[in-house]
Amino acid sequence: MLYLLALVTVLAGLLHYYFTRTFNYWKKRNVAGPKPVPFFGNLKDSVLRRKPQVMVYKSIYDEFPNEKVVGIYRMTTPSVLLRDLDIIKHVLIKDFESFADRGVEFSLDGLGANIFHADGDRWRSLRNRFTPLFTSGKLKSMLPLMSQVGDRFINSIDEVSQTQPEQSIHNLVQKFTMTNIAACVFGLNLDEGMLKTLEDLDKHIFTVNYSAELDMMYPGILKKLNGSLFPKVVSKFFDNLTKNVLEMRKGTPSYQKDMIDLIQELREKKTLELSRKHENEDVKALELTDGVISAQMFIFYMAGYETSATTMTYLFYELAKNPDIQDKLIAEIDEVLSRHDGNITYECLSEMTYLSKVFDETLRKYPVADFTQRNAKTDYVFPGTDITIKKGQTIIVSTWGIQNDPKYYPNPEKFDPERFNPENVKDRHPCAYLPFSAGPRNCLGMRFAKWQSEVCIMKVLSKYRVEPSMKSSGPFKFDPMRLFALPKGGIYVNLVRR
């Protein structure tokens, strides 16, 4: 018995040492930060699914108001959380080449070759190739299709709201963004069966699992073990979708030159030349396997539909709570649409100045893309400090913390679109507003996201008002199992026909 007790004691001691061995890293370097917990580091609440990770980072941001750089532990791995906007500007923009990678690599067969997670060279080539899909000219050509999707969406709202005006607004607007992404990006017209399949798939994509924590504990392990952040069912679905869509198109271009047209062009080339930083640099071409192609379809779908749906959910919630803002917005929508014979055009959207402010303020208060992550490609001393981050270490920027900091946004809990008047914007630090990140690696589809959201909002508010629901009257309790921050149980509003 004594031997067993001694063995257990020794084993416990070894485990404690192993899971705390790095915890003096920042203390030795005189970098302030929260006290880590064995095994969990500073992420205990998110690992135990008590809070979303984004809210854990916000809490750390709030805890150290006088620090420029905060030393944190993502599990047992030393990382930093940046608070100083000038330093953030250096990392994201001025010294971008030192932080070009996100540091989240996983199996290329498990969707890891997508443009969001791709490393520097692969990312550059993919970004350059897909940028033409999101030019102003391309988006203008998509507006009539977005408007048609919006009209069908209103018809579906008419049906459900007649018998049940109280609706989960997130579930509702998801149907619009799913259908719109499918139509504008993939050239697909979704039927009810496909919508149900995508709704089921949502749970697999946006329910958090422990792959990310494993990669924090052992950086690079997912890539080494050919593992993925997403379940096999997700990659299998997008592999099949890619195959079926390309087979349907059979090399015939669409009238609007959508993403599938670009993918068909890439397929014919077989490889994609990687960008060279220097003229004489020897780089290998990226082989365009079916896995690489389906990874792009996955990320454009994932990023395009859920971020917009979540943003609109919060926007309609705030309008229901603030009827004066809703009245002003409805008046603008009615006036602008009347000048354009009810048609939503590029010129029409350009005149929707108050809608733009409401949208921007929603993303200020609820930055659904959560936090920005970058990996150091070299040892780097943060400007204005003597703090060095080592090559391979991770940087976190708490967008939620910055954009709800009273230092930059007085009374941050107040929903105030006037924060985005031109005179207020010009006096604000450029890195005080980062819903789409900043610099060369900002969100490629941010204009698409804004336009599709504005089309949906205009369609809804031209026919309906939103009013508060008793189901969503209390303080939010964010769902710790959801990848993007969304209240547990969703958000409900009452849809009232105008």
From Swiss-Prot:
Its EC number is 1.14.14.1. Keywords: Endoplasmic reticulum, Heme, Iron, Membrane, Metal-binding, Microsome, Monooxygenase, Oxidoreductase. It is a peripheral membrane protein. The gene is CYP6B1. Induction: By xanthotoxin, a secondary metabolite abundant in the host plants of this specialized herbivore. It catalyses: an organic molecule + reduced [NADPH--hemoprotein reductase] + O2 = an alcohol + oxidized [NADPH--hemoprotein reductase] + H2O + H(+). Heme binds at residue 443. One of its GO terms (cellular component) is endoplasmic reticulum membrane. The keyword Iron applies. Its cofactor is heme. It comes from Papilio polyxenes. Belongs to the cytochrome P450 family. SUPFAM superfamilies: Cytochrome P450. This is Cytochrome P450 6B1. Midgut microsome. It is an enzyme of class 1 (oxidoreductase). PROSITE patterns: CYTOCHROME_P450. GO terms for molecular function: heme binding; iron ion binding; oxidoreductase activity, acting on paired donors, with incorporation or reduction of molecular oxygen, reduced flavin or flavoprotein as one donor, and incorporation of one atom of oxygen.
